[in-house]
Amino acid sequence: MLYVVRAVKERKPFVDEILKQIPDAVVYYDRFGNAMKSYLHVCKNIIAGEPAVLLEDDIILTSNFREKIEAVISQHPDTLINFFSLSKKYLEPHWKKGREYCMNQCEYFPEGFSLRVVEAYENWPLKEKEPTAYDFLVGYAWGNNNPYLVWCPSLVQHREVKSIINPRRSSKRQSVTFEV
């Protein structure tokens, strides 16, 4: 399984924590100073259509992360899976429609999907309005009629830190279902 961590240099200590559980993960440090450009670069040139787990740098992994995530993926290898949920309503695994907001802290891309994300960006109606909103782009690329799986309990926790992309965002974006 390919694991890719998207990161910025300021978050290297967090990346080092992730690498303790996933030592063979590919770490991509943003070279563009542009979240969307970096995201598309990773999708096109690093994942390049392979099945992969894409992680952000500001997360904490559950214990036995790799064992848990690979067990879920083995049951749903052809499905977009999100491993972080902010929902207080759904405390168990559930399906969401494509085109909805898709949290990007940790997600599994099935074979070929990363290239669909790159292609979808060309026709994405929010490209100008939401230049860093790859969380919406992923749902758009997956499509309206394709539900994706949101796994609960969350296998990652969003750290309580300021967003580098948008410092005005709340740092209080943690999952109630995360288990250490």
What is each stretch, according to the model?
Residues 1-55, 59-180:
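An acidic/histidine-cluster motif and surrounding catalytic segment
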